[in-house]
UniProtKB/Swiss-Prot annotation:
Active site feature: D150 (proton acceptor)
Name of the gene: CIPK22
GO BP field: signal transduction
Segments of this protein annotated with the region Activation loop: 168-197
Record note on domains: The activation loop within the kinase domain is the target of phosphorylation/activation by upstream protein kinases. The PPI motif mediates the interaction with the ABI (abscisic acid-insensitive) phosphatases.
Name the record gives this protein: CBL-interacting serine/threonine-protein kinase 22
Lineage: superkingdom: Eukaryota
EC assignment: 2.7.11.1
Organism: Arabidopsis thaliana (Mouse-ear cress)
Cofactors required: Mn(2+)
Amino acid sequence: MAEDSNSSESIIVNVTGDDNKSALFGKYDLGKLLGSGAFAKVYQAEDLQNGGESVAIKVVQKKRLKDGLTAHVKREISVMRRLRHPHIVLLSEVLATKTKIYFVMELAKGGELFSRVTSNRFTESLSRKYFRQLISAVRYCHARGVFHRDLKPENLLLDENRDLKVSDFGLSAMKEQIHPDGMLHTLCGTPAYVAPELLLKKGYDGSKADIWSCGVVLFLLNAGYLPFRDPNIMGLYRKIHKAQYKLPDWTSSDLRKLLRRLLEPNPELRITVEEILKDPWFNHGVDPSEIIGIQADDYDLEENGKILNAFDLISSASSSNLSGLFGNFVTPDHCDQFVSDESTAVIMRKVEEVAKQLNLRIAKKKERAIKLEGPHGVANVVVKVRRLTNELVMVEMKNKQRDVGLVWADALRQKLRRLINQPVYKVPDKP
């Protein structure tokens, strides 16, 4: 049972035993083993409280985390709680017993992309489809300061519609990890997919490193083999550093040009995500508006996730709220949250009233979310309303630029709190 009904840690389900014999936490019926890794196993399960919907549950042994893997698990929770995108595996809940941590995730029923590409190369048309979906997910992550750092077919899954789902964010880096020189400094990734600048053991740009890995994935999809291969690891690194690869004869001229820019060894000259969106091969046969897909800012306002579960509350709260799992934790956004018993429509109307009083511009608006811009559009705040229960909603205000000294944002925050009832749940500002 939870230790204290008044503590934020009570949101995490902790039980006295390891597993309920009939159903995990009285909710999930564990099924077959889908796979296992260095410190976790993944099972298929049925959500008994949601009509038997199939989910995937990653089970992490806490005792394995004593070997320095705690940061790895913390990072995966921190990253995945930020991400809601159609081509990224959704993490819906985190539960714990005395000995295990359970990640409840969306089940990608189509399996690994790797298993399909190893049996046969893809056509350019199919390669283009998956590359577009990959770039859509990568663009979304980068807009939120998240760099995957281990993009490879084994971490690219397929759903029941054969659409792409990016998974395994255990090696991901966030903007909070960037050094004063503006670079990341941790060597991560799988050798055949790592960018050449990572091999220099100096600082590197996480977004540029991800783009290189996307290039390796695209090469593999089209060719059926990796661009850089050598039985000797140092020989492999030399080929990566010099970008020595041979494209198959069937590769079209436009694809050759794109791969050349993706696998550019100089990160300063490497193609960017925004440039990829304008590339002729990338755009072939599709309306440009369909390619870009969900814009980063637009997805902040999407209805997806409008009903909060326990995991949303844990992960959006202050650092102490995850101590029931494994200690201190850092909240990445400057965020203010409180609970109200007013309707969403009433709250949204009041937000607009306050915005008008403060001369703020409504940049974007949806039923449960609104994006406000200050003078000259130099900063913005997103206000979202998500349902907690039949009677209560959570009002969340995020300063996207994380500028805690923004005067108009502070004024907006104070006015909203006074206007939309006295808050009963408040996330403290990050020190």
